[in-house]
C-alpha cells in the first residue's frame, strides 16, 4: 500500500514529465470547470462519463475558447490520479514539427513515436492545426505520422484524448480514412462546441 506522501510524489512526477506546464494542472481540474451554460454542462458530463465508463477515445471539437483544453487536461489528470498511469501531452503543431524534422533520423523519430504510442494516456491538443496544404488537404507527411499514431494506439487499446478547432465532419472531409477511423474510435465520447459564451465573462475555462 502506497502512503499518501509517496502517492503524491508519484502523481507529481507523472504530471511534471507529461509535457504540459505543471503549474496549469491545478487550475484545469474537473471541479474548476465552469458550468454556467448547457454546453459547458454537456462537456463536463461527457468527461465524467468517459472516466466512469472507462472509455478509450474521447474527442472535443469546435470553436476556440470553448474550454476544450481545460476539460481534456482535467480528464487526463483524473485518470493519472486514479490509476497512476503514464501520460503524455502532445501539442499537435509543435510535436508534428519535431517529428517531421526527425523523419531522416531513425533513432530520434523512433524514440519520439514510441513515447506517443506506448504512453497509457495521450492527449493530442489542437489536432491538425496549420496542417493543410494549398489545396485544403492534410500535408502527406503529417497524415502518415498521425495515422500511425492513431492506428498503433487503437491496436494497443490505449486511452487517447483529442481536441481540435475542426469538427469531426470537417476532419472526415479532409481525409475520409483518418476521419472515419477517429469517428469510429470516439463513438459516443465526442462533443462539438460553439464556445460562444465562454470567454465573455470574468471567469473562463482555459
What is the predicted role of each segment?
Residues 32-58:
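Pre-Walker A (pre-P-loop) alpha-helix and adjacent loop at the N terminus of AAA/AAA+ ATPase modules
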Residues 55-73:
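Walker A/P-loop nucleotide-binding motif
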Amino acid at each position: 500500500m502506497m502512503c499518501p506522501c509517496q502517492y503524491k510524489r508519484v502523481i507529481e512526477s507523472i504530471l511534471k514529465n507529461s509535457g504540459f506546464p505543471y503549474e496549469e494542472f491545478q487550475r484545469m481540474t474537473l471541479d474548476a470547470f465552469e458550468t454556467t451554460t448547457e454546453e459547458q454542462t454537456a462537456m463536463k458530463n461527457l468527461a465524467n462519463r468517459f472516466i466512469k465508463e472507462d472509455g478509450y477515445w474521447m474527442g472535443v471539437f469546435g470553436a476556440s475558447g470553448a474550454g476544450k483544453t481545460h476539460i481534456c487536461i482535467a480528464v487526463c489528470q483524473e485518470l493519472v490520479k486514479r490509476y497512476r498511469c503514464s501520460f503524455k501531452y502532445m501539442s499537435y503543431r509543435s510535436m508534428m514539427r519535431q517529428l517531421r524534422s526527425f523523419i531522416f533520423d531513425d533513432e530520434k523519430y523512433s524514440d519520439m513515436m514510441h513515447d506517443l504510442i506506448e504512453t497509457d494516456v495521450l492527449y493530442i491538443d489542437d489536432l491538425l492545426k496549420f496542417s493543410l496544404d494549398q489545396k485544403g488537404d492534410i500535408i502527406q507527411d503529417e497524415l502518415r505520422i498521425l495515422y500511425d499514431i492513431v492506428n498503433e494506439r487503437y491496436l494497443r487499446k490505449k486511452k487517447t484524448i483529442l481536441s481540435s478547432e475542426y469538427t469531426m465532419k470537417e476532419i472526415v472531409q479532409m481525409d475520409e480514412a483518418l476521419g472515419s477511423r477517429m469517428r469510429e474510435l470516439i463513438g459516443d465520447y465526442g462533443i462539438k462546441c460553439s464556445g460562444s459564451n465562454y470567454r465573455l465573462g470574468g471567469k473562463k475555462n482555459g
